[in-house]
């Protein structure tokens, strides 16, 4: 279960697109004297023409209010299929807002992330990633690269966190789950269309640096977990997506809490510490009038140490917005 939560916890997944190295071209080792290798190309998720219409989703929404400030808290599913969700109380709240705030602003041109990837994702120590994997995990990496049309050495010079993220996102895309359908992308497009202010709680570089701050062993643990569970993604994804679509916060809470049991340190890094930071940001924003629509990964609004519980410690109460079905 951690494999998807690892990507789903970050807005980076919503804006991330892999590079465009030609399929079948080996990535050379990186060194300070030569350009960083490009990761294998990411396939674009394509809807199945004969697929049945996807069900309408009713994800959870919260609100924090005082006399002159309203802050909506919307939990997103960063990588999503084409099911409709931008309606009902979510659309009403967004339309009433004058500012959109994301974990990280989604760049209009995903290629703009390339310099950041080159700065942080390359292992310049000279170590080869396959040399650090067991024979079974090396074979799993080769199998994972095959659908991308990438050679076995495509990730030799990349850090484990980047390989984990890339494999998770591309595997999701092969299931028709894409950042193109994700709430961050759709909300950003809607905000730009009405010239709405867009802010961020962290930013792409901050999130990349957080990935990069994990210890080497933590990164390797995530990569091993990813390689050993990619084939289970359809079964892993289904309950998470169902809980999000139904606004079932209790089920999401069980999933998030279970994901943190094996590595409390990573759970604190990805969830607890960031949730506390965001609660403090909201406290400061409540001092100024206006209406703000905050969209962050749903896992941050579901775990036992979620943003709402952090807000309670600061004296603010987040209440669930009732679902009201409207014609659409």
Regions found by a protein language model. Give the residues of each.
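Sec-dependent N-terminal signal peptides
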Residues: 1-23
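Intrinsically disordered, low-complexity proline-rich regions
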Residues: 2, 34-37, 315
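Short, well-ordered alpha-helical scaffold segments within catalytic/effector domains
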Residues: 4, 87, 275-279
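N- or domain-start disorder-to-order transition segments that initiate the globular core
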Residues: 24-68
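Structured, acidic catalytic/metal-binding patches in enzyme active sites
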Residues: 49, 53, 58-270
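A cross-kingdom marker for long, charged
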Residues: 264-328
């Amino acid at each position: 279960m951690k494999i998807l939560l690892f990507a789903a916890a970050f807005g980076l997944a919503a804006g991330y697109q892999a590079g465009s190295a030609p399929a079948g071209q080996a990535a050379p080792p990186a060194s300070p004297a030569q350009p960083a290798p490009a990761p294998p190309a990411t396939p674009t998720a394509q809807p199945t023409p004969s697929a049945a219409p996807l069900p309408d989703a009713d994800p959870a929404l919260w609100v924090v209010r005082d006399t002159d400030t309203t802050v909506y808290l919307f939990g997103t599913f960063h990588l999503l299929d084409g099911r409709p969700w931008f309606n009902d109380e979510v659309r009403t709240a967004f339309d009433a807002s004058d500012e959109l705030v994301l974990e990280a602003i989604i760049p209009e041109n995903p290629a703009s992330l390339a310099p950041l990837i080159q700065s942080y994702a390359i292992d310049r120590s000279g170590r080869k990633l396959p040399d650090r994997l067991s024979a079974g995990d090396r074979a799993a990496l080769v199998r994972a690269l095959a659908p991308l049309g990438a050679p076995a050495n495509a990730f030799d010079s990349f850090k484990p966190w980047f390989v984990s993220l890339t494999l998770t996102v591309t595997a999701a895309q092969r299931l028709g789950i894409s950042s193109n359908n994700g709430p961050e992308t759709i909300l950003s497009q809607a905000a730009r269309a009405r010239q709405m202010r867009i802010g961020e709680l962290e930013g792409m570089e901050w999130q990349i640096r957080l990935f990069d701050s994990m210890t080497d062993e933590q990164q390797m643990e995530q990569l091993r977990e990813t390689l050993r569970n990619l084939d289970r993604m359809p079964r892993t994804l289904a309950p998470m997506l169902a809980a999000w679509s139904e606004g079932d916060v209790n089920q999401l809470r069980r999933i998030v809490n279970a994901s943190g049991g094996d590595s409390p340190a990573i759970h604190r890094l990805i969830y607890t510490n960031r949730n506390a930071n965001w609660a403090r940001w909201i406290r400061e924003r409540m001092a100024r009038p206006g209406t703000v629509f905050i969209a962050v990964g749903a896992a941050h609004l579901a775990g036992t140490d979620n943003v709402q519980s952090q807000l309670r410690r600061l004296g603010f109460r987040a209440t669930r917005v009732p679902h009201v079905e409207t014609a659409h």
